């Protein structure tokens, strides 16, 4: 028989105080929660730990990014299972129980995740009731069978943001482990709402830089440099062209966006690490 205290919840945050509090409100206090706060804010740590007795908040000395932060927490997990959540998620009352029910019926799995359907798809297809085998899942909610990761490890820490979930799923499948989507599990996800800062432009620059860096790195990792170069060289040219056009016509914000996209892609192509961090 499995219990809620068999699950540890892992949440990586960066100035996400309001969002993570809403998330924590939806989590049963029988579950241990590890929050990794990348801002280094002692105020956030004190507030979370004083409000929620089941929460340990780890402050990082630097902004480590999603992969490294999650790995730090996952290596501390002592329970059978871990649920990795984005801070902008809300669990429903039966979310954790439904995960545990699936653990009892699916004996051999590495990752479980909610089955997501858009409203348009729901109109035309019947929602399945049984677990669905999958090759990849969305990274906002990933339920880990911890023992399956002792040998293969968790996230690739070269990814700061984006593609780390797809990459991990690929590694899981390559090592003959199983991934399932669960129609019974419901988790609300707001999407792209994790960070609570007034400088939206800086966050947009950061997202664009890392999207391009991670895109090329992922394709290089799994297809080799030449294949990745063939795919992304046209994108390098078009990104540079758009940067020039927006610069000439003085669209400052769009010009900077494409400059950041260009920088992220170029740095990845020449083999530099994912070094950019939002200036906040």
How should these model regions be labeled?
Residues 13-29:
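Short, well-formed alpha-helical segments that are part of the catalytic scaffolds
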Residues 37-46:
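A conserved acidic beta->alpha catalytic loop
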Residues 60-77:
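Glycine-rich, basic loop-to-helix element that forms the pyrophosphate-binding segment
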Residues 82:
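Short aromatic/hydrophobic "clamp" motif used to bind/position activated sugar donors
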Residues 89-124:
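Conserved donor NDP-sugar-binding/catalytic core segment of glycosyltransferases
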Residues 141-144, 148-153, 158-186:
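A short, conserved alpha-helix in the catalytic core of glycosyltransferases
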Residues 182-202, 215:
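Active-site donor/metal-binding and catalytic loop motifs
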Residues 206-214, 225-280:
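Non-catalytic, C-terminal membrane-associated alpha-helical segments of glycosyltransferases
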């Amino acid at each position: 028989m499995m219990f809620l205290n068999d699950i540890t919840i892992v949440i990586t945050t960066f100035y996400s105080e309001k969002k993570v509090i809403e998330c924590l409100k939806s989590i049963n206090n029988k579950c241990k929660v590890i929050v990794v706060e990348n801002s280094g804010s002692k105020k956030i740590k004190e507030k979370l730990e004083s409000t929620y007795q089941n929460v340990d908040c780890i402050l990082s000395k630097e902004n480590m990014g999603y992969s490294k932060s999650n790995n730090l927490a996952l290596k501390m997990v002592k329970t059978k299972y871990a649920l990795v959540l984005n801070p902008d998620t809300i669990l429903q009352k039966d979310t954790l129980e439904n995960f545990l029910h699936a653990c009892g019926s699916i004996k051999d799995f590495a990752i479980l995740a909610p089955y997501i359907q858009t409203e348009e798809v729901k109109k035309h297809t019947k929602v399945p009731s049984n677990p669905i085998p999958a090759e990849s899942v969305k990274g906002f909610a990933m339920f880990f069978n911890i023992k399956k990761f002792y040998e293969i490890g968790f996230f690739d820490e070269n990814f700061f943001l984006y593609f780390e979930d797809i990459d991990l799923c690929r590694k899981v499948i390559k090592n003959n482990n199983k991934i399932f989507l669960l129609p019974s599990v419901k988790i609300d996800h707001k999407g792209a709402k994790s960070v609570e800062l007034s400088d939206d432009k800086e966050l947009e620059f950061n997202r664009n830089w890392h999207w391009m860096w991670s895109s090329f790195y992922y394709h290089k990792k799994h297809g080799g440099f030449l294949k990745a170069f063939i795919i992304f060289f046209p994108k390098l040219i078009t990104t540079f062209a758009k940067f020039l056009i927006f610069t000439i016509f003085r669209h400052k914000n769009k010009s900077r966006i494409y400059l950041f996209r260009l920088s992220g892609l170029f740095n990845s192509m020449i083999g530099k690490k994912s070094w950019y961090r939002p200036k906040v």
